[in-house]
Amino acid sequence: MTFRTNPSAPLWQTRLPATFRPSEKLAGLLQSPSLTAALRDLPCEFSVRLLYLGLADGSLLLDGGGPGKSYFCRDVELCLDGEPVVWARSQCLPSSGYWRQMLDCGNRPLGERLFAESADWQRSPLEFAALEGIPLPSVQNAQLARRSFFQRQNETLGLVECFLPALAGYL
């Protein structure tokens, strides 16, 4: 299944794009339910670098792009041995107390909090998109992204993770 709500946005699909041919190890990491856990399993030092926390325009990658729609956002880089390998954005409505509190975790991984607590949320299937030719001001050189949406008591958290070329050097 594929869909696109904005013609300049990526085409999201439930399988890895046919044009993207990752190694078996990278394919496994891309499809891991918890990217935090998958990156921590690598023989490298894993860290999170908080880039931004607060109100911002919605991400085009989460179909919240466009003027006039503000979200509470958390932008981070996931790093291996200090090198950024993933750029990620999580966003929710400013009125979402639960998800805002969840996102306020500093340099701790969001995945650590999401998967450590009792899962009283539902998660959508992972979706993938090739990013070639998509103008993304926040992300340099990302070739692929994945996203999913977490639902809890009629409140939604969107999460997009953009994979940077440096990741291949750690696999």
What are these regions (language model features)?
Residues 1-171:
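Composition-driven recognition of glycine/serine/threonine/acidic- and proline-rich low-complexity segments
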